[in-house]
Amino acid sequence: MEHKEVVLLLLLFLKSGQGEPLDDYVNTQGASLFSVTKKQLRAGSIEECAAKCEEEKEFTCRAFQYHSKEQQCVIMAENRKSSIIIRMRDVVLFEKKVYLSECKTGNGKNYRGTMSKTKNGITCQKWSSTSPHRPRFSPATHPSEGLEENYCRNPDNDAQGPWCYTTDPEHRYDYCDIPECEEACMHCSGENYDGKISKTMSGLECQAWDSQSPHAHGYIPSKFPNKNLKKNYCRNPDGEPRPWCFTTDPNKRWELCDIPRCTTPPPSSGPTYQCLKGTGENYRGNVAVTVSGHTCQRWSAQTPQTHNRTPENFPCKNLDENYCRNPDGEKAPWCYTTNSQVRWEYCKIPSCGSSPVSTEQLDPTAPPELTPVVQDCYHGDGQSYRGTSSTTTTGKKCQSWSSMTPHWHQKTPENYPDAGLTMNYCRNPDADKGPWCFTTDPSVRWEYCNLKKCSGTEGSVVAPPPVVQLPNVETPSEEDCMFGNGKGYRGKRATTVTGTPCQEWAAQEPHRHSIFTPQTNPRAGLEKNYCRNPDGDEGGPWCYTTNPRKHYDYCDVPQCASSSFDCGKPQVEPKKCPGRVVGGCVANAHSWPWQVSLRTRFGTHFCGGTLISPEWVLTAAHCLEKSPRPSSYKVILGAHQEVNLEPHVQEIEVSRLFLEPTRADIALLKLSSPAVITDKVIPACLPSPNYVVAGRTECFITGWGETQGTFGAGLLKEAQLPVIENKVCNRYEFLNGRVKSTELCAGHLAGGTDSCQGDSGGPLVCFEKDKYILQGVTSWGLGCARPNKPGVYVRVSRFVTWIEGVMRNN
């Protein structure tokens, strides 16, 4: 069984001024290599381990791994190109970039890739061989030139680039066709451009990707870890014809950059397919009809649709004829259509080797489900967990079990048919300590999931808990339990999960250690031999053990029970249906407990709203246009059915209305009496001021609005929608510049899912770490669930200061 890691606080080791050597490495948390040629050494830090790798003389060190708690360094001759990556707990794998790269910089003097054929297709002779050609350059005469195997190299600094002696007796040597690295130039559309150009075509300075000034945006580096959004360098994260950036000019949001094209052929993009695999970016079949039966327009044509997805702008995307393709990272192949009324549509491409996943058929007439009042949790070690959580303890999105990107692995549905490896849901296929998943972050191979163990009663229908008011900030109780990952735990447990006594933190027997001691971590509570979590390990409190053969282990410290209901944490797990309020699904009853039905004084539902505190509801300003009098409105809380209201529903009058002073489509309602917070009525959390939701974040809308003939009318429905970055949403083919910076877009561009009339004012919530945060108020759209016309929502974070001021002063 493979082992796994927990997130390491690398900042503990990356001291200022000492991190430069590590810039030459790619690091992956929670990963190890099957290595044959290796050395195991002791090192006090990651930098010390890197130095040992650089100093190694007996073999070429291409990678090393560092165990933080054990202070163990393993240097290795292999890397991911010659070995298999596995998961391992408490390990970070560092691989030298130069040995992973298959491109050259300049004349390729430092090229260390594995190309072993010349540009004329002749196999290279081994550098250590003397047949058929006696070499002038060999590993013995030039030991620092990387003359391994028969790989192309440039030991003599030849201006024409890497070369090799050939296995053809008639040709002593030949040059190799190594593509240029995308540092000074770009291949294709610059999706992999890695250079440092930071000015636009017109000479404007680029805004840093991690800055929200002068332009707020959703391309947040931590949310797009595979897009290399460094500093203010030009990049192409969204399928434009070439790299671009946001500018430092407040009057110019973004502009393309002038990156020259590389003169060498681009690297191979991998195998191509005649069927649909993944999102179809490598589909090269001949389907030329959309899902609605429209004929595709030729990519080189500009009639009837004018566009910039041309063969010239996307030279590597094989935009031949009018065949369906995916040149810009959409969710599936598509094309512009020859119907002037339909700009573009997705295509129906047969899947490679598997039938489409069937979706659950939902009964629109079914009564509200009697769902247990429980949080999503797991029993035992979680091998039986079959929930839909897909977020790790640090908030990272899980990689699909059937995907090999960004992490190649063997934990597939085919290899583990009984493990429930569906979509990207958290699972425990290998009997680990709890559910986990591979992450979509290339630098973090896997993490445990943001789930808690079920208590004795969770998982079965239980009586509703007592009614309580909203909590103040939680403080640890005297009970021996922990909050979160237990970094603040100061209890007196001193045995591991296996019952082994802990070694005292100040002791050096049986295990020597220097990083986690009372002297180095005086505020971490490292007293006696008590379980602690000084490094914020997401696995929870741990200790060095008194077993000489077991360096450290985790402790079994339970989570503290919350004494009240926290904002954004429903007591019923939402369904989170992946389907396309039009085209969504009926929600689990009371799984969105902040949902408000805004009604006329006669009881007619006409808008949605969101409970944000016991006395306050947030809604859209346009919902209040018919009357400025609070007495015209009332709110319904805790409802699942629109008409036949359940007995527990709370009906409260509105005492005051507050419209946003700059006329944004957002308003506050003060209730005549505070709502009673129960398991069915819980506020949503507000975001941080000016927080920007990253593009492609999956969020949820809910409401009773118009369903346009789809199922579930009269019951609360939900739909999952991706946020669309405003830059994309404002493209000509979508909303054509209509979306303001105080608004956000969300929706499926193919249509079929949207909020409609009657959903106005309702919530768009996004899951962040362990709770749902209100990021949007349903505002407007061009039609309802139309293709290419996503819904528009007021960006709540831009108005948090106003919201809090109104609530505080009234």
UniProtKB/Swiss-Prot annotation:
E.C. designation(s): 3.4.21.7
InterPro entries from the UniProt entry: Kringle, Kringle-like, Kringle_CS, Kringle_sf, Pan_app, Pept_S1A_plasmin, Peptidase_S1_PA, Peptidase_S1_PA_chymotrypsin
SUPFAM superfamilies: Hairpin loop containing domain-like (SSF57414), Kringle-like (SSF57440), Trypsin-like serine proteases (SSF50494)
Catalytic activity: Preferential cleavage: Lys-|-Xaa > Arg-|-Xaa, higher selectivity than trypsin. Converts fibrin into soluble products
Disulfide bond sites: C49-C73, C53-C61, C103-C181, C124-C164, C152-C176, C185-C262, C188-C316, C206-C245, C234-C257, C275-C352, C296-C335, C324-C347, C377-C454, C398-C437, C426-C449, C481-C560, C502-C543, C531-C555, C567-C685, C577-C585, C607-C623, C699-C766, C729-C745, C756-C784
Pfam families, A to Z: Kringle, PAN_1, Trypsin
Post-translational modifications: In the presence of the inhibitor, the activation involves only cleavage after Arg-580, yielding two chains held together by two disulfide bonds. In the absence of the inhibitor, the activation involves additionally the removal of the activation peptide.
Record keywords: Blood coagulation, Disulfide bond, Fibrinolysis, Glycoprotein, Hemostasis, Hydrolase, Kringle, Phosphoprotein, Protease, Repeat, Secreted, Serine protease, Signal, Tissue remodeling, Zymogen
N-terminal signal peptide: 1-19
Compartments where located: Secreted
Major localisation: secreted
Domain PAN: 20-98
GO cellular component term, pick one: extracellular space
SMART domains: KR (SM00130), PAN_AP (SM00473), Tryp_SPc (SM00020)
Enzyme class: hydrolase
UniProt remark on domains: Kringle domains mediate interaction with CSPG4.
Additional note from the record: Plasmin is inactivated by alpha-2-antiplasmin immediately after dissociation from the clot.
Protein name, UniProt field: Plasminogen
Natural source organism: Pongo abelii
